Amino acid sequence: MYVIQINKATKTYNNGTIAVHPTSLNFEPGTFNAILGPSGAGKSTLLRMINGLEIPTTGEIIIQGQTLTAKNLRQVRSRTAMVFQQFNLVGRLNVMTNILTGRLYYIPWWSSILYMFGQRDWKIAQWALNRVSLKEKAWERVDRLSGGQQQRVGVARALAQRPEVILADEPVASLDPIASEEIMELLREICRQDGITIVANLHQVSLALRYADRVIGLNKGRVVFDDSPQALSNNKNTLRTIYQREDGSVDDTLEMAVTD
């Protein structure tokens, strides 16, 4: 069974903008999938549809055999964790409390308001903290951490959900090159060792080629490439197809990719 199935899904906004044209994609369990494309290609919208943050205009999203609907949104979201470019952490709270918010799907609403977590939640959060090698930072305020450390907290929060899928929306775009490599290594390790499917929007082509099992190229809301990193690296014309603008010029990302 595929862990994610996208069946002819589209997204059109009220102003008539088509963010995603009819798209069908399947994702295997335990694979690392990178999505490339210029700004405005529909990458973030696609991830948000998978997580239920955006509702497809037409088509359907299926997670672990269950079609995403308004009625089962909370249940399905609990199995698809998000990692964000800007971390989406509460800076004034400590690391452990931020990680515990990954357990909010599993506790009553009144407990979530009071940040009342059970023993199992604490054990899972501690495991997630150790998994990202931040044990010594457990009680430190998040806003005192480096960018790379904050993203590790973001990954730990995602792990605390015990998800089948982690959706990473530009997870290293705000980080320096060394921290970027460390986060990508961590995500690949989680994919390999924990069997969690990773779907990551990336700006850096070189990282997609180095870490992904599969690369999907989007341009103007359409899938224009879907193959292995090796197939992409062997064909620079395909890179131009992915990053070509409407006026025929190419996105700056392509120039960086060619010189990587």
UniProtKB/Swiss-Prot annotation:
CDD domains: ABC_PhnC_transporter (cd03256)
SMART domains in the cross-refs: AAA
Keywords from the UniProt entry: ATP-binding, Cell inner membrane, Cell membrane, Membrane, Nucleotide-binding, Phosphonate transport, Translocase, Transport
InterPro entries listed in its UniProt record: AAA+_ATPase, ABC_transporter-like_ATP-bd, ABC_transporter-like_CS, ABC_transpr_PhnC, MetN_ABC_transporter-like, P-loop_NTPase
Main location: membrane
Residues spanning the signal sequence: none
Membrane topology: Peripheral membrane protein
Residues the record lists as binding ATP: 37-44
Cellular localisation: Cell inner membrane
Domain ABC transporter, first and last residues per copy: 4-245
GO molecular function, one term: ABC-type phosphonate transporter activity
Tree of life domain: Bacteria
PROSITE patterns, per database record: ABC_TRANSPORTER_1, ABC_TRANSPORTER_2, PHNC
Catalytic function, reaction form: phosphonate(out) + ATP + H2O = phosphonate(in) + ADP + phosphate + H(+)
GO CC annotations, alphabetized: plasma membrane
E.C. number: 7.3.2.2
Broad enzyme group: translocase
Family: Belongs to the ABC transporter superfamily. Phosphonates importer (TC 3.A.1.9.1) family.
Subunit-structure text: The complex is composed of two ATP-binding proteins (PhnC), two transmembrane proteins (PhnE) and a solute-binding protein (PhnD).
Family annotation (PANTHER family): AMINO ACID IMPORT ATP-BINDING PROTEIN, PHOSPHONATES IMPORT ATP-BINDING PROTEIN PHNC
Function: Part of the ABC transporter complex PhnCDE involved in phosphonates import. Responsible for energy coupling to the transport system.
Protein name: Phosphonates import ATP-binding protein PhnC 2
Organism: Trichodesmium erythraeum (strain IMS101)
Gene this chain is encoded by: phnC2
